[in-house]
Amino acid sequence: MKKKIGLYWFTFDLRLHDNSLLVDASSFLDELVCLYCRPSVTPFLHHFAQEVTLGRARQKFIDASLCELNDALGQLGQRLWTLDLPPYQALKYAIQYLSVTHLYSDAMAGSDEQSILHKLQDEYPHLVIVQHSVRSLFDESKLPFTLPDLPETFTQFRKCVEGIDIAHPIDAPSRLPPMPKGAQLPTLSSFYFDESALFSGGEWSGLAHCRRYFFSGLASSYKETRNGLDGMAYSTKFSPWLALGCVSPRMIHAMLKQYEQTQGANDSTYWIYFELLWREYFYWYARCYQQRLFRFGGIRNQPPLTSFYAHRFQQWKNGTTPYPIVNACMHQLNHTGYMSNRGRQLVASCLVHELGLDWRYGAAYFETQLIDYDVGSNWGNWQYLAGVGADPRGSRQFNLEKQTQMYDPNHEFIERWQGRDSRAQQDVVDMVGWPITTQQENGDK
């Protein structure tokens, strides 16, 4: 009887707990290979973000998460193989080299990943592709609508799903099939732990953070503090580990319910669930709209009245705009890979309205920098702010001065992140709109 050789493609599901796909693979396969393809800056991303690599903080968080996953796999006699190739090439190589019969993959929200799986299925008709979501609160089969009929707004979605029972998270597999004999693929290189990082990536680190948060009692006051700009205590900070799948939303939901049973439920604990639903909506939003997630005109094909000005975009990225609160937020992002939810709304509003820029440039830059980058949440929320997405009220413009008075009245955040430091501000541009550097102004001496 032919061996069942499986390839598990880890993407945004970097964990063993609450991973039904991995449990299914462990009980069915004879041999297993676990593969991860490192993310890179695609031509599309390079065009809009104007970056050639991912931000340092994001890459470090990914590295730490991979190391923890590799250690966890090692305890079950497995290891994580990595290939520095585009995913399609990496998967194709592994399938051919190892004679893979079954490919396991999370039902990812991104259209690029879905396209890769379709191409592989066409090229290898014998290949059995097993796919289902391990990153969502709800199974697709439990949704009270088909995916093409996804509610047009979050409020409609919330009202549809709030009554659905959420499955309890399952345990990690107790065993995994062995690797194919003689298999030789690149493994993780040595990793330098960055003790200065704001967040430590990985499944164990993520679960520990969630437990600390609920143990602290902060969940009972979350709604009152959630609009803060700086610090660790004002919000849950679950998003970095949720984004890479180091922690499942069902695990957080189970912790939340346990907290409510022991400490009591209130508006704040409900609002944590509300935020999980917001994230859930944009997961299915990305699954539904696919390529329309990245179009200038959004899901309704209604392009906004914005354009692209290279010098303004560089000012925004570097935090040298005329708006101190925006500068402070961008400095925070560039240094830590993280920004508050309120900050993201302000810098997005500034890019679209004050600077008149195509929203996709901001969304793409966020993708390169954010340690909690999630395709649906990032691109869906940018569409929402730009008025080309799920918001029935159209684009949202924030009064930056008023927002500063509300959320940073003493300018402590602005001072800490040097929001008034615009010494690098470029107001002079060349013939194609790029900032002229001091060296260029001096004749490239």
Curated annotation (Swiss-Prot):
This is Cryptochrome DASH. The keyword Repressor applies. Keywords: Chromophore, DNA-binding, FAD, Flavoprotein, Repressor, Transcription, Transcription regulation. Pfam families: DNA_photolyase, FAD_binding_7. Signal peptide: none annotated. PROSITE patterns: PHR_CRY_ALPHA_BETA. It comes from Vibrio parahaemolyticus serotype O3:K6 (strain RIMD 2210633). The gene is cry. GO terms for molecular function: DNA binding; DNA photolyase activity; FAD binding.
